[in-house]
Amino acid sequence: MSYGLTGTSSKLRGTSSIFSWTQVRHFSRRRIAYPFYPFKKLGRQHPKKHDTNLKTAMRQFLGPKNYKGEYVMNKYFTVPTNHVPNYIKPDLERGQSLEHPVTKKPLQLRYDGTLGPPPVENKRLQNIFKDRLLQPFPSNPHCKTNYVLSPQLKQSIFEEITVEGLSAQQVSQKYGLKIPRVEAIVKLVSVENSWNRRNRVSSDLKTMDETLYRMFPVFDSDASFKRENLSEIPVPQKTLASRFLTIAESEPFGPVDAAHVLELEPAVETLRNLSTVGEHSSGHQQSTNKNTKVIYGELVEGERSQYKFTNAKVGKVGYRYGSGNRDNKKDRRIGFNKLGQMVYI
């Protein structure tokens, strides 16, 4: 609510001007975003007790505290351990976020301040679709949680590529995983094995790994609905802007012509390039058949890093003296490569 002044003036014959001012109140169009479900609102209270209905609704949602200051009766307090994410679902629970910490039965805060079972059983929380459980944002049904891989599956992928000599394309088609993800699994498993040999995996890392693994759903290659779309092409950055082109009515215009207008390669070439990504792909040896000279420095005892020197062409590396370098700037330009990954330009 704001205040303003409005004035009028009048002038009588033979007299000076007369001004009249009136104070007017202007109401703001903004409305407080109260919860859409019913909750206990504040009544008459002491003027010095500065409390709001939003704070009251928040306390009703969180529930009572224990002696440690933790909201143990809130269903979102504990970390899930059954590979089912526990995302907030306000459109289904409608304020019923409390449950017994032992029996897991729903509770509701009554108007007299006591806790008890809800008078009406919420049937929305009984028959929930599986896709709804994987939705982290209630208002965005298109965003779904990805599936994590079990340690046994990651070890199998690592052995099939490094020991049996299979290519990344063969493993990708077998398990229904994208080639960049298969390459990342091989790299991460090799790093994890090297850390285990050196005893560099602490107990905190193991605890965090087990906790995150139990929080998210597990990937199953036998289930067809869990397999990834291997023919999916990342959206190029140049297609996000509109392009207008005037052509004749009888002139043919297809996807290849659209790719030329947008300065993009056809989808067939993009899929072919995506299939050769990674050092374990079938076409990697043919694409990198050039001999490169590498010189390794002497590894001093006690050090974990080793210098590596490779040949470089002048003008291809480094920055020219006097040229602008925006590596440390906040507004550095960001682009996207063929895989859809963000890269600095």
Curated annotation (Swiss-Prot):
UniProt record, GO biological process: mitochondrial translation
Main location: mitochondrion
Disulfide bonds: none
One MF annotation (Gene Ontology) recorded for this entry: structural constituent of ribosome
Lineage top rank: taxon: Eukaryota
Protein localization: Mitochondrion
Cellular component annotations (GO), alphabetically ordered: mitochondrial inner membrane; mitochondrial small ribosomal subunit; mitochondrion
Boundaries of the annotated transit peptide in chain numbering: 1-27
InterPro entries tied to this protein: Ribosomal_mS45
A matching Pfam family: Bot1p
Keywords on record: Mitochondrion, Ribonucleoprotein, Ribosomal protein, Transit peptide
Keyword Ribonucleoprotein in annotation: yes
Primary role: Component of the mitochondrial ribosome (mitoribosome), a dedicated translation machinery responsible for the synthesis of mitochondrial genome-encoded proteins, including at least some of the essential transmembrane subunits of the mitochondrial respiratory chain. The mitoribosomes are attached to the mitochondrial inner membrane and translation products are cotranslationally integrated into the membrane.
Miscellaneous comment in the UniProt entry for this protein: Present with 3460 molecules/cell in log phase SD medium.
Subunit details: Component of the mitochondrial small ribosomal subunit (mt-SSU). Mature yeast 74S mitochondrial ribosomes consist of a small (37S) and a large (54S) subunit. The 37S small subunit contains a 15S ribosomal RNA (15S mt-rRNA) and 34 different proteins. The 54S large subunit contains a 21S rRNA (21S mt-rRNA) and 46 different proteins.
Family listed: Belongs to the mitochondrion-specific ribosomal protein mS45 family.
Protein's recorded name: Small ribosomal subunit protein mS45
